[in-house]
Amino acid sequence: MIKQIISIIFITLWTIFSTYGFITPFLIINQEKMFVETLKKSFQVLTSFVLKYGFGINLKCNMNITQTKNKVDILIANHIATIDSFILLSMLEHMNISNFIMIGKKDLIYTPGVGLIFMFGDHIKLARNWEEDKNTIDKQLENIKEGIIVLFPEGTRYTEEKFKEGQEFSRKNNLPVYDNLLVPKSKGFQAIYNNLKNKNKLGNLYDSTIILENKNLIDLFKKDSTNVHLINRILNKEELENKDFKSWLLEKWSEKDNLIKTYSKIKYENMYLELDENFLFLNLFIYYNVFILLIENKEFRYYFLTLIVIAYIITYLKRNQFVKKS
């Protein structure tokens, strides 16, 4: 448990230190894509490192995902736990894919470190109001030319209470009753799919089934290691030509439900951690020298603390502007 707690503290300090201390001033002055992409990649590498060595999570995957050149791919997944997003980002990092686009509540921009990645990137920020969100999706997709959109059609993570409510809802409405999954929602997913398809920007449609041996986050603190199985597959887009989108999605979720029941029969490969040495070296080099300077140089200490305070103030003002615009 001590190792896991240290890992959480480490990743929290890293995100605050790296974003507010160094990258924020550059983003405020000029929101160059280079800084955003560097931050995303660096965060991916750190996420993979912490999941593996902090929480002892072993990723096992049945197939790789490839990014389609000059197209926008969509990756859908079940939402089983708090760390699902980090698991998928780590999986994509193992596959050397850093051009990811996340979908989430706009309130995420207030999360230190991760909030900056979500705010300045091309990520789709939702207000949970469909009329507003539909416009946001269409507007944001105009800026996305290439990459992989990662989304959870269930809209919320798995809990026993939500699971039982979903089963009851399905029975009342004559829908498939799942044994391991929540009921997926099709509206947002369909809007993204149709937008990309109509503009000839749609690449591959991927599905990832996440299977955790320990669903409860508390269980991760109690064990030294745990396995996460990822069953990836390419979905046939042509099926949607003659099917209702909602019915098609429910059908795919039934297939996912069966995959979870039989996941032990599938052949997996361990995803070994191959960290990008350039990013690791850059981070370690910067942090080591900064901490040395903080200890040895009083003037720099004051400068650095002032920089962080200014970055927080400017970022807060920028966030208010962002919220008003969106």
Task: Give the label of every model feature segment.
Residues 1-74, 86-87:
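Membrane-anchoring hydrophobic helices of lipid-metabolizing enzymes
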Residues 55-59, 313-326:
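Membrane-helix interfacial anchor on the cytosolic side
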Residues 54-217:
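Soluble catalytic domains of membrane acyltransferases
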Residues 229-235:
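A glycine-rich helix N-cap at a beta->alpha junction
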Residues 243-286:
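Juxtamembrane amphipathic/hinge helix adjacent to a transmembrane helix
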Residues 1-21, 271-320:
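Alpha-helical bilayer-embedded segments of polytopic membrane proteins, i.e.
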Residues 217-223:
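Short proline/glycine-enriched turn/loop segments at secondary-structure junctions
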Residues 237-241:
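Short helix-loop capping/hinge motifs at secondary-structure junctions, enriched
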